[in-house]
């Protein structure tokens, strides 16, 4: 396993501006012998505008890192957490499952998008200078390396360590006779009735293989005729991925099915069987127009998604060549897209193993507390959130501050309050048993005006969002689906309340989805406020989303696609002016993805002028830090851990009057051009200081993180020069909350 590197070990080649101008990232052709957060098909071309040059020389070619390579590097960081022996054991299994799930989505969306561009002849070079075919070949080679490392980590490291702790992941041949007998009974009663063997012969065409399904390719022989036949058995996805043969011993469900194939093909000889798994293009393409019912259009597209073309075939490395040739031929997939792996395939099944109740093998339990400004002192009664917000704004930092006693309680109190007249809410992703949805339904049924903007195009949550949209409509909520051609990704909630002779607006602007379950796992920020300017801004924005308002300027918001990119770029340029005048200047950015070329170029310009630029990014980063003459004043860091870093923050020195924004937008074309996104300006000085401290701590050399070098390589910094562990910022925040439950500062 690659050990964490100390700072002293992080030696990167320092390309000059001149060398970068002639540089194009190396591509590696896939070597095949006989035979990967926030992903989007965001493949727009970019040309530096004259305005962005700010009077300086044009920036060099080759200044952008390839985003697909960068995404694969992000998933490699996930894999490094699984490989790290200091990660709790069941969390290592969980990171293996996350890596596999991430890679599934990467192939379904990004690889599928590249193949579509190649097939349609849209061969525009990416900002990194690569043609789609070159990018695809790099992905095939790099993902093959990472998948091999992933399998090795499971087989050689995590599985043996689990066995030492009494959690045995075994194959059928390793089971005792009594265990096999028990599983045969389970097979007869619970598995056999739902299996459907499908033969392939002149009367039975090759069956449809659904995306991400696990399948058995079976070869049988008719003992009468001696003819060999191929059949396919799909492993039902509703069955548990690992079955408990006896306490602490788990076997893959496909092994149990394979051991009893004679039951499915009576009178035939089962000669061989091999597991395979297919990944298909599952990116949605919904053509919208003003007259179309978006709900119906999306439902039709979800049906078409099942038939997307194949983009990856995983097979057990022991697969028979004749069987593999048949699969490749019938599935119409290229040899370069075949990935032979040691079984078991589909290690997303390790999510099931992670759920085993062994707390000593997981991260220590953390229960979020109620934010101090919302908690009733020495009282068991529910806090009056509206009264608290009339006193001061509340800056929330989840999961360290409880979502259920803040944002959820805010909406539940609004639903039950007879003085509340209206609630307006965006929903991008929410849970199946959502108390947020329940509160909105309760409000509508009690006669309140409820507007819900449901983004039914949130990838891979479309079916759930359709379901909740209908449920909300049936209860009397006004449900709208946003603006044609734009996804609504902003996280907004507005409550209008009658208070005496006046109406007061209470608002929530956040970085995360209104999803109580993920709020315990995702790091996010949110601002609760009764500020009239924010309330007026949210009213205007909701009117734009539900009606025909064309308002594009706001008081305390920056809103994409009109003002957000330009607003941030102009503020970065203003830092250059402050720096030249000798005033305090800095740019600090925390995002999931840093890809947008205009924003990256603005950071380069700031660096060239001497402005320090810090970028804290979880996933993709196209920016090259540390290049002399271009970006020597830019640092890029990444933090991964038990919580998924999801907040977006933008902080500027602003000549000594700090300006800080938080909201939903990542620095990607899709967010800035094809989504409704919103950032809110944070005005409370204590909140601004708290957010700047958060950014400083995340970027500190004393914090465990990955550092990005100018060559695009990420280096893990987990120990100091003496080999002592660096501080973990997430654990530091947990400890702070345990010491002083719920404070105003993250």
UniProtKB/Swiss-Prot annotation:
Record field: compositional bias (Polar residues): 1-17
InterPro entries in UniProt: PP_kinase (IPR003414), PP_kinase_C_1 (IPR041108), PP_kinase_middle (IPR024953), PP_kinase_middle_dom_sf (IPR036830), PPK_C_dom2 (IPR025200), PPK_N_dom (IPR025198), PPK_N_dom_sf (IPR036832)
EC numbers: 2.7.4.1
A GO MF label: polyphosphate kinase activity
Cofactor list: Mg(2+)
Catalytic site positions: 489
UniProt biased composition (Acidic residues): 37-53
Region feature (Disordered): 1-60
HAMAP family, alphabetized: Polyphosphate_kinase
Organism in which the protein naturally occurs: Streptomyces coelicolor (strain ATCC BAA-471 / A3(2) / M145)
UniProt KW keywords: ATP-binding, Kinase, Magnesium, Metal-binding, Nucleotide-binding, Phosphoprotein, Transferase
Name the UniProt record assigns to this protein: Polyphosphate kinase
One GO BP: polyphosphate biosynthetic process
PANTHER family, sorted: POLYPHOSPHATE KINASE
Residues that hold ATP according to the record: 102, 522, 618, 646
Post-translational modifications reported in the UniProt record: An intermediate of this reaction is the autophosphorylated ppk in which a phosphate is covalently linked to a histidine residue through a N-P bond.
Gene that this sequence comes from: ppk
Family of this protein: Belongs to the polyphosphate kinase 1 (PPK1) family.
Catalytically driven reaction(s): [phosphate](n) + ATP = [phosphate](n+1) + ADP
Cellular compartments per GO CC: membrane; polyphosphate kinase complex
Protein residues bound to Mg(2+): 429, 459
Its biological purpose: Catalyzes the reversible transfer of the terminal phosphate of ATP to form a long-chain polyphosphate (polyP).
